[in-house]
Amino acid sequence: MPYYYGYGFGIDPLYLLVVLVCTVLGLAAQNYINSTYKTWSKVRSDGDTGATVARRMLDASGCNVVGIKGVAGELTDHYNPQDNNLYLSDANRSGGSVASVAVACHEAGHAAQRQSGYAMMKVRTALVPVVNFTQNTWTIVLLLGLFMNIAGLTTLALIFFSFSVLFQLVTLPVEIDASRRAVAYIEQSGMSSKQVNGAKKVLTAAALTYVAAALTSIIQLLYLMARYSRNSNR
C-alpha cells in the first residue's frame, strides 16, 4: 500500500518487496495444492465416493446429525458449524478418487472437532465475528489516521489487522488437526498404503496454503508496524 510522507504519498521499495514475497508465497502454495489435487484425483480410492466415506467418518465420530450438501466450484469444500453441514464440491462429493476422499474426510474432521469440543476450533469460531468486522474496516481506519495525522487511529488500524493475523495463526492447528483426524480414519478404512500416502500428500498440500496465508499476514503486519514506527519517529 502507499505510505504517507506527511504531505503526500510515495512508493516504498520495501513495500514492493513485501508484495512480491507475499504474491510468490500465495501462488506457490496454490499451484502446489492444485497440482497435487489434480494428480491424486486421477487415482481411485476403494470405489466409494467422497460423500460416502465422509458420511461413515461422521457417524463413527458421533456426528450423525451433520448433513452433507453440494457446493459449486472447485476446492470450495468446507464445514459450516452454524448449520452443521459439510459442503462438498461436486468433484469431491460424487467422485471416488483419493483426492476426493481426502478432502471430504478433512471437512468431516472439522465436524468431529466440534463434536469433541476441540478448544482451538472454539477459539477460531469466537474470532469469526470480530475478524469479519476488523478486516473490513482496518484499511479505512488506517487511511483516516494517515490523512488526518491521528496516531491513535493508525494504532487502532494495526490492532484491527492484528486480529486477522491471530485468526490465521489459530486456523493452522485447526486445519492440521482436521487433517490428522482424516488420515487416522482413512488409514483404518481399508485403503492401500499408496492411497493413504496420496491422501496425506493432498492434505499436506492443503495445509501449506494455510501456512502461506499465515506467513503473508505476519509479513504484512511486520511491515505496517515498521512503517508506522518509522513515521512516528519523524
Features from the language model and the residues they span:
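N-terminal signal-anchor/start-transfer transmembrane helix
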Residues: 21-31
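Core segments of transmembrane alpha-helices
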Residues: 133-143, 216
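Membrane-helix exit/interface motif
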Residues: 113-119, 141-152
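Polar-ligand-bearing catalytic/cofactor-coordination segments
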Residues: 2-9, 13, 30-132, 166-219, ...
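Hydrophobic alpha-helical transmembrane segments
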Residues: 9-18, 150-159
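Alpha-helical transmembrane segments of integral membrane proteins
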Residues: 18-22, 164
